[in-house]
Amino acid sequence: MLENIRSDFFLKFLCQHIKDKDKILRLFQYNKCLQKKVKLSINDYRNKYYQTIIGIKPGETKSNIRENVFIRISRNCYNNYHIYFNDDKTEIKRNYLEHNEKIGKIKVFIDYQVKSLKALFLYCNVEKIYFIKYNRKDITDMSLMFYGCHSLFNLDISKLNTENVRYMNLMFGNCKCLKNLNISNFRTEKVEKMNLLFQGCSSLEKLDISNFNTNNVTNMMGMFSFCSNLKKLDLSKFKTNKVTNMVGLFENCYSLQKLNLSNFKTEEVTNMSYMFSFCTSLKFLDISNFRTNKVTNMKYMFNHCESLVNLKIPKKFEICKDNSLGIFTNCCEELKEKIKKEKNLDEKIFDDRLCGFSFDHYRSELFNDEGKSEYIPFFLRLNSCYGAFNTYELINWKDPTKLKIL
């Protein structure tokens, strides 16, 4: 008999329908790929897994579960387990939610007690996700929710209520196969962190976020970085009065041709490094409304904006003295000449030959195996002596040596 804790309806249902004297269930810890075996007897539904079970439909087996999974998310996402039926006592070597085994479709139902959906599908190799029967208002954290879902191409989140969400950082990060994303239902008035929100969505062709309320956002680092297929972004309704971090905001948006930043307020921003780096298709940019008096880092801000010939900057465009290396590195000569005529600036901001090596990396909060919060790098940027930039993705956050060039 298992530890006596309050009964769970789902387990009660299972136990009452056990035909054999006892049954071995395989429980997979959802986001850690760990396996546990649990022995249940008839009417034995009082156990330590109360409200930490992700259920599947009764009768589903290994043969069909990969095509259509139904999961029930309970109170604490970090301790959820997935029930897997197995009549014999052989060990199941792999979790079917691992990166290298695709799942066709997942339907999700979320319990009322849930407060956080952080890292819910982290690195889950799934193609389709649908949320059903869900309109809870008390979710506060959706960070890393779909991060690293490289195979995901169909995502229905129209039932998600984001009314009280405060954290959306890395929510869709590295969803490389997503071409369309409908988030017109999102309410974001309470969101504080949007850093790396769409980072690495390299297949995304259109993105309508005209409904976004960004009044309380403080961090927009890398929000659209590596969205290499996006051709235009209308951010004219964005309120950025509280934002302090705009590092790499549009970095590596190679296809971006139109960018409306007319409503951007940057009085509180302290870091603009790499902000437009490698926006190679951008020809016109108006940042005449920018205020940079608090900015302490502008390194490589317009690096490799090779097509940019028309840049409107404010009359009082203050460039920080200490971290201004390569602001206009590898920009077209026409733009460089215009900037030189308008302002008396240090030549290092135009320098195409960068001395030495430096390492920058985006960092985001994640939970390690012990459930403790820690900071880990997701991306590592290597700047060479000749203005060449290689950006690497960290394949395995447990082993920082495993890198893949992007």
Model-derived regions, located:
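Canonical leucine-rich repeat
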Residues: I92-K93, I106, L117, I129, ...
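Positively charged, low-complexity intrinsically disordered regions
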Residues: G200, K232, K258, T292, ...
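Core hydrophobic positions of leucine-rich repeats
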Residues: S116-Y123, T140-H150, R166-K176, E192-C201, ...
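Hydrophobic anchor residues at the C-terminal helix/turn of individual leucine-rich repeat
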Residues: N4, I110-D111, L120-F121, F131-R136, ...
